[in-house]
UniProtKB/Swiss-Prot annotation:
One of its GO terms (cellular component) is extracellular region. The keyword Secreted applies. This is Putative uncharacterized protein SSBP3-AS1. It comes from the Eukaryota. Glycans are attached at N64. The gene is SSBP3-AS1. The keyword Secreted applies. Residues 1-18 form the signal peptide. Residues 58-69 have a biased composition (Polar residues). It is found in: Secreted. Keywords: Glycoprotein, Secreted, Signal. Residues 48-86 are annotated as: Disordered.
């Protein structure tokens, strides 16, 4: 049990050390947070953060106006119909169920 926890702690601490030493800081948790914060700020300045798409209000209104309203005939789901074989098979099975 303790061996597992020690291995887990090493697995967590190793990236902290490498990131901190790459950034030229002493390896500490505080240093890792600073490095992550700096990297995140740089990514945000370049618009690379996940889930953030920068769109101006004018651009958004243009996109909304050009969007098609409702499903088009090509994308509308087609109704599923059973073929004649399935229909006759269903009748046969019902016939077998209610046969005396």
């Amino acid at each position: 049990m303790w061996g597992f926890l020690v291995l887990k702690a090493r697995w967590l601490v190793t990236p902290v050390r490498t990131l901190a030493t790459e950034a030229g800081q002493k390896p500490s948790l505080r240093g890792l947070l600073d490095v992550g914060n700096i990297q995140h700020r740089a990514a945000r300045a370049r618009g690379l953060t996940r889930g953030v798409i920068r769109v101006s209000p004018q651009e958004r209104s243009q996109q909304n106006q050009s969007a098609p309203k409702g499903p088009t005939p090509s994308t509308r789901p087609k109704p599923r119909t059973l073929g004649p074989q399935a229909h006759s098979l269903a009748l046969q099975s019902v016939d077998l169920l209610f046969r005396p």
